[in-house]
Amino acid sequence: MKVDPNKEKALAAVLSQIEKQFGKGSIMKLGEDRSMDVETISTGSLSLDVALGAGGLPMGRIVEIYGPESSGKTTLTLEVIAAAQREGKTCAFIDAEHALDPIYAKKLGVDIDNLLCSQPDTGEQALEICDALTRSGAVDVIIVDSVAALTPKAEIEGEIGDSHMGLAARMMSQAMRKLAGNLKQSNTLLIFINQIRMKIGVMFGNPETTTGGNALKFYASVRLDIRRTGAIKEGDEVVGNETRVKVVKNKVAAPFKQAEFQILYGQGINRTGELVDLGVAHKLIEKAGAWYSYKGDKIGQGRANAGKYLTENPAIAAEIDKTLRELLLSNPSAMSSSSSDDENSEGNVDFETGEVF
């Protein structure tokens, strides 16, 4: 296609002027001087990494994780921190709920000695700390736990019973406008944990909503809905949760996929159990009766023993993990557990926020 040389000269002149005024990189062609692949951090769950499409949570973006109480929201974010720290990244945890347990975090593999932690007094303080950490360019992952606990200063200084309609939503809206651009420039991943509330008077559709207004729903590149679907028992003792995560919004890959995995109390995500299940499903691990074998060698009788073998032999576990990632990320449809959620297809979906109505 022939381009008018006068237009080319005019474009070159204006681009030069913009770069001189606002700095190099302030405007560029989409495919120029940058990797088209999105840098990601693992969630700690292979099936969830595959459901996300890109292999994990995207850097330089805002992510929202929401769900009912005790569904595994904080555990999932601590797994992300542990994965980031293993890659040498710097992480910060804004504990607005004042409920972070350092002993539990350490059990999940978090290096608590190098984890930055803040327990802010007000919502504005929490978001200002986020903004300062982001602009520094020195922090790679920031977790905010949770949006519901980000209380505006006016509400804290007021009396119980005072009306403060829309204060939190206005605060979050302003923060999103400030943070979004800075996060992209510093390539920082910002994860907001959120709680669920019920809309009053909803007769049809989903009555659930999240706190903090609508701004976060629009600015988030990824929104994850995490739910506890059952209990894991050893005899009569409950030792963990069966967990399902739905990707209700995804701007970096196809949305509406889901992943199922186990969260064990005091241990976090059951990675080796996932490897055994996915390995068998994709014929990397052979199953004959109750026995599991890998490359002709028996690795255990029963799923628990096979998982224990992989825990004791991390090199073999890493080899299986690498092979599965290459297989599933190149062909995500091969994984049945991360198929599109049938429930979402039954209702109307807001493609901007991922909400079903």
UniProtKB/Swiss-Prot annotation:
UniProt function note: Can catalyze the hydrolysis of ATP in the presence of single-stranded DNA, the ATP-dependent uptake of single-stranded DNA by duplex DNA, and the ATP-dependent hybridization of homologous single-stranded DNAs. It interacts with LexA causing its activation and leading to its autocatalytic cleavage.
SUPFAM superfamilies referenced in this protein's UniProt entry, alphabetically: P-loop containing nucleoside triphosphate hydrolases (SSF52540), RecA protein, C-terminal domain (SSF54752)
Protein name per its UniProtKB record: Protein RecA
UniProt keywords, alphabetically: ATP-binding, Cytoplasm, DNA damage, DNA recombination, DNA repair, DNA-binding, Nucleotide-binding, SOS response
Span of the signal peptide: none
Keyword Nucleotide-binding attributed: yes
Protein's organism: Shewanella sp. (strain ANA-3)
Annotated positions binding ATP: G67, P68, E69, S70, S71, G72, K73, T74
Listed SMART domains: AAA (SM00382)
